[in-house]
Amino acid sequence: MSDIWDDEEVRETPSEITRVKRDHSQAGYLAGVTKAKDESLQEGFNAGYPIGGQLGLSIGRIFGYLQGKGLVEEEKQARKELSSTRIFDRQYWTTDAAPTYEGVHPLVKQWENKIDVMKRE
């Protein structure tokens, strides 16, 4: 057993050097991928937050009106038609998660129009 304070030169074998290089390369790759994913997620969040917030607010107003008026069947229908599955259907969004429509989401617009009619009756 050698003393840790010995002046003996530590020699690494080629396999140890290869392993260390591989480990450092993998760690660098993983750090790069993680950073890129984090940046991409943040950009997506920043872009989608205002759209999602507006959708939630609009849909909440629709549900609130129907509940407030005691329109149980209409509310059930609205919840079905304005479900997240339908709101986020592929026909309304590009592969980059941008809306394919301009202005108000078409399903929300339909319900806003229905409520406008109800208010006039």
Swiss-Prot record:
Family: Belongs to the YAE1 family.
Chain intervals for the UniProt region annotation (deca-GX3 motif): 28-68
GO biological process: protein maturation
Pfam families, A to Z: Yae1_N
Protein name according to UniProt: Protein YAE1
Annotated signal peptide: none
Source organism, top-level taxon: Eukaryota
Chief location bin: cytoplasm
InterPro entries hit by this protein: Essential_protein_Yae1_N, Yae1-like
Compartment(s) of residence: Cytoplasm; Nucleus
Subunit structure: May form a complex with LTO1.
Job description of the protein: The complex LTO1:YAE1 may function as a target specific adapter that probably recruits apo-RPLI1 to the cytosolic iron-sulfur protein assembly (CIA) complex machinery. May be required for biogenesis of the large ribosomal subunit and initiation of translation.
Coiled-coil parts of chain: none
Organism: Yarrowia lipolytica (strain CLIB 122 / E 150) (Yeast)
GO cellular component annotations of the record: cytoplasm; nucleus
Gene designation per UniProt: YAE1
Keywords noted in UniProt: Cytoplasm, Nucleus
